[in-house]
């Protein structure tokens, strides 16, 4: 399962960029198998895999027709939304267990 593989690789430091005013994304060097089964409502804090090498962290709620593989969710959504939307475009996120 993709989420399990992602967890096995933690901690993981990813340099991310802004996209569409609702997400931060970063490319990982070691690919993760995807099932690309999730599309629809994206929630604040959703952590997704796009393709097999793009980690996406969403900080705004919206609907998408694109398919993602769900990896997890940030627990402190309110704090995330406030801090990450104001963050510099060249940001590094460290994911830990």
What are these regions (language model features)?
Residues 14-97:
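Glycine-rich active-site loops that engage anionic ligands at enzyme catalytic sites
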């Amino acid at each position: 399962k993709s989420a399990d593989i992602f967890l096995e690789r933690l901690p993981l430091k990813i340099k991310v960029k802004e996209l569409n005013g609702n997400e931060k994304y970063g490319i990982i060097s070691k690919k993760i198998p995807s099932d690309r089964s999730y599309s629809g409502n994206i929630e604040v804090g959703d952590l997704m895999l796009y393709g097999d090498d793009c980690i996406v962290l969403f900080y705004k709620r919206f609907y998408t027709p694109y398919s993602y593989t769900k990896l997890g969710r940030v627990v402190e959504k309110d704090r995330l939304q406030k801090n990450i939307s104001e963050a510099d475009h060249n940001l590094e996120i460290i994911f830990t267990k």
